[in-house]
Swiss-Prot record:
Binding site for ATP: 158-165
Name of this protein: ATP synthase subunit beta
Species for this entry: Geobacillus thermodenitrificans (strain NG80-2)
PROSITE patterns reported in the protein's UniProt record: ATPASE_ALPHA_BETA (PS00152)
Gene that this sequence comes from: atpD
Superkingdom as given in the UniProt entry: Bacteria
């Protein structure tokens, strides 16, 4: 253990000088532990990460927690390795910070638990899985129109209060129940209150036992917010590589990862690039995203909530993220206001997996027909608003008639929302989803009322609901 001294403190950036020409490697973790000697001092237990070498024996580091109370001359110890965090089954049902320390007021992690470094190379080219496999979510609108790929990266767009969190919870629930899969949730630079609410909601809905949670929220210094995504990813990699699992990794919010990187870059004195972002923006994003993939052992499928600053999709932060995505799920406030949940926009959501050679010819054709019908309905809405339905041709009336049924049938009840809705949730296999929409498009259920299609699972439930409404089927 080589020792050094703090020689400069600039907010979250700390310079450390070592003895005898020792120079810790880049990304090494350094520890400062100081006991308060009087009431003017505070106890300090701080981890620093080496970012730059300044000469033969001096390093510039980024603090992973507040530097309050730090003074020049304090002793620093080089741990000789990067930050490492606990991995494996001990992480399930627990909440951690960026350093892998539990913050849920439960027992400490056993000392003998395995710990892995958060900085690791991406899987080698020959280790990657070559076949494209669809991840069935049981959520109709996702499986039909913007299917997720195992080992893929999905962007989740949506404003406040349109159902991002509930959709994330339902995905965690369905993967745990139907696939026995594990989920890792990384809260990056978001509100602590939301993280707390999510933890309690997951506890209530019973999915917490299959989930590890890591938080570096918006009150933390930029170093913690920048590294917490890597902490979550390291935990997910263990389940993929050592247990052969298909893991879900949720990152909320990936924009905050870039934002923290930008703050760190400025503090380190790097020249900013476009819009004031760090010059290493694409590299940092690539290092994170390339580790999220399918290998011959298992897969990490990542769902990343993306905040778009000022709704400007050309901003370098979201634009860099887009280049890595395989699918997008867009949540639309208008649909939420109509009571259609999940409020996924069927026309704006996309996936590169929606191709006949991946999902099959029938699925592809049904999805395209659904999109065409909804698109035509969208075009006709202005005419309907001005002139009314009576002015439409018979053909267009039929399009509107079916489109409204399709729109309602894209909604369904969620398991994790049972305590609010009082209705049991539904998991719909892809085959059933495709069959249901094909039959609606073919006019098999034109005689059933629109309301029978709202918030149901399989197409058989529509028929039962219509019977309960007193309609002859």
């Amino acid at each position: 253990m080589t020792r050094g001294r703090v020689i400069q403190v600039m907010g979250p950036v700390v310079d450390v000088k070592f003895e005898n020409g020792h120079l810790p490697a880049i990304y090494n973790a350094l520890k400062i532990q100081h006991q308060a000697r009087n009431e003017n001092e505070v106890d300090i237990d701080l981890t620093l990460e080496v970012a730059l070498h300044l000469g033969d024996d001096t390093v510039r580091t980024i603090a992973m927690a507040s530097t309050d109370g730090l003074i020049r001359g304090m002793e620093v110890v080089d741990t000789g390795a990067p930050i490492s965090v606990p991995v494996g089954d001990v992480t399930l049902g627990r909440v951690f910070n960026v350093l892998g320390e539990p913050i849920d007021l439960q027992d400490d992690i056993p000392a003998e638990a395995r710990r892995d470094p958060i900085h690791r190379p991406a899987p080698k080219f020959e280790e990657l899985a070559t076949e494209v496999e669809i991840l069935e979510t049981g959520i109709k609108v996702v499986d039909l129109l913007a299917p997720y790929i195992k080992g893929g990266k999905i962007g989740l767009f949506g404003g406040a209060g349109v159902g991002k969190t509930v959709l994330i919870q339902e995905l965690i629930h369905n993967i745990a129940q139907e696939h026995g899969g594990i989920s890792v949730f990384a809260g990056v630079g978001e509100r602590t209150r939301e993280g707390n609410d999510l933890y309690h909601e997951m506890k209530d809905s019973g999915v917490i036992s299959k989930t590890a949670m890591v938080f570096g929220q918006m009150n933390e210094p930029p170093g913690a917010r920048m590294r917490v995504a890597l902490t979550g990813l390291t935990m997910a990699e263990y389940f993929r590589d050592e247990q052969g699992q298909d893991v879900l990794l949720f990152i909320d919010n990936i924009f905050r990862f870039t934002q923290a990187g930008s703050e760190v870059s400025a503090l380190l004195g790097r020249m900013p690039s476009a819009v004031g972002y760090q010059p290493t923006l694409a590299t940092e994003m690539g290092q994170l995203q390339e580790r999220i993939t399918s290998t011959s052992k298992g897969s990490i499928t990542s769902i990343q909530a993306i905040y778009v600053p000022a709704d400007d999709y050309t901003d370098p932060a979201p634009a860099t993220t887009f280049s890595h995505l395989d699918a997008t799920t867009n949540l639309e406030r208008k649909l939420a206001e109509m009571g259609i949940y999940p409020a996924v926009d069927p026309l704006a959501s996309t996936s590169r997996a929606l191709a006949p050679e991946i999902v099959g010819e029938e699925h592809y054709q049904v999805a395209r027909r659904v999109q065409q019908t909804l698109q035509r309905y969208k075009e006709l809405q202005d005419i309907i608003a001005i002139l009314g339905m009576d002015e439409l041709s018979d053909e267009d009336k039929l399009v509107v008639h079916r489109a409204r049924r399709i729109q309602f049938f894209l909604s369904q009840n969620f398991h994790v929302a049972e305590q609010f809705t009082g209705q049991p949730g539904s998991y719909v296999p892809v085959k059933e989803t495709v069959r249901g929409f094909k039959e609606i498009l073919d006019g098999k259920y034109d005689h059933l009322p629109e309301d029978a299609f709202r918030l149901v699972g399989r197409i058989e439930e529509v028929v039962e609901k219509a019977k309960a409404m007193g309609v002859e089927v």
